[in-house]
Amino acid sequence: MTKVIHTDNAPAAIGPYVQAVDLGNMLLTSGQIPVNPKTGEVPADIVAQARQSLENVKAIVEQAGLQVANIVKTTVFVKDLNDFAAVNAEYERFFKENNHPSFPARSCVEVARLPKDVGIEIEAIAVKA
């Protein structure tokens, strides 16, 4: 049975979708853009945007009763692949700080545009151990 996951600690959906769905043994998040859920603001630089998107993913994963360590796959959408190294560095910091046993599998794709003209969006798949 599918369960909808919602938390006020991540931005509300800006379209006809939910923050995540829990399939019982697997959690699928919608893409998280770097909107601070408390202020509605978007950080200016790509490193802070990457961190905010990851923190939003974390909030959703934790609302489902899981941890960052349960994330097995992410998809990262960036507006500019020239930001790849900066995003990678923050991504690595985030997963190390959150005690991920390795790193999740990942795809990274450059896209023409993202909602609210942000520089990054991240979605994740997490599994229950």
From Swiss-Prot:
SUPFAM superfamilies linked to this entry: YjgF-like
Any GO molecular function: deaminase activity
Assigned GO CC terms: cytosol
Gene3D superfamilies from the UniProt entry: RutC-like (3.30.1330.40)
PROSITE patterns in the record: UPF0076
UniProt similarity note: Belongs to the RutC family.
UniProt protein name: RutC family protein PM1466
Protein's organism: Pasteurella multocida (strain Pm70)
